């Protein structure tokens, strides 16, 4: 029997060489080669086989922002961020509010706080996170958004 206060830790490779989705080779490239212009740090990791990708941190451009994501995961991450950001942005102390919101989400998902980054979530965890965020919004008097992420399915799902 597991201890109730033990939280799951997500082991994320922030310098990927193998794709977490298809096992293909990952390259570290300047992102203008994909997007036509440079964004953020100017760098990204991209799978040569399935084209999954992830951006990198601006101050640490070799460090990935999370796991490689296909178009389904990219859409789900965007929807989760849009929904959760409304819970803390514009608050008097945004940093404290953001920390509290993500601590709440981590608890609901059974994750340790350090693992609670939307960029670290696979599609299954993104679906769970979206449901939890909708509950959090409702509890705070904000409207629920459509079940968007929960309905995102890959062809093989």
List each model region and its residues:
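Long C-terminal interaction/binding lobes of large macromolecular proteins
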Residues: 131-157
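N-terminal cysteine/histidine-rich coordination modules
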Residues: 1-61
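Extended interfacial segments that mediate partner engagement and assembly in macromolecular machines
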Residues: 60-95, 99
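Short, surface-exposed acidic
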Residues: 96-121
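Short, charged/polar micro-motifs that form catalytic or ligand-binding hotspots
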Residues: 5, 9, 40, 66, ...
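Chromatin/DNA-recognition segments of nuclear transcriptional regulators
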Residues: 115-135
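Surface-exposed polar/charged interaction patches
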Residues: 90, 108, 136-139
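Intrinsically disordered or highly flexible coil/loop and linker segments, enriched in small
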Residues: 93, 114, 139-142
């Amino acid at each position: 029997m597991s201890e109730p206060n033990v939280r799951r830790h997500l082991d994320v490779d922030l310098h990927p060489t193998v794709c977490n989705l298809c096992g293909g080779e990952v390259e570290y490239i300047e992102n203008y080669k994909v997007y036509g212009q440079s964004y953020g740090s100017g760098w990204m990791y991209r799978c040569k086989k399935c084209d999954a990708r992830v951006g990198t941190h601006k101050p640490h451009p070799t460090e990935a922002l999370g796991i490689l994501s296909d178009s389904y995961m990219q859409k789900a991450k965007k929807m989760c961020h849009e929904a959760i950001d409304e819970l803390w942005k514009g608050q008097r102390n945004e940093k404290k509010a953001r920390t509290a919101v993500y601590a709440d989400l981590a608890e609901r998902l059974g994750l340790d706080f350090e693992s609670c980054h939307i960029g670290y979530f696979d599609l299954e965890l993104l679906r769970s996170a979206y449901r939890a965020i909708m509950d959090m919004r409702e509890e705070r008097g904000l409207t629920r958004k459509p079940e968007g992420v929960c309905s995102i399915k890959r062809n093989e799902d």
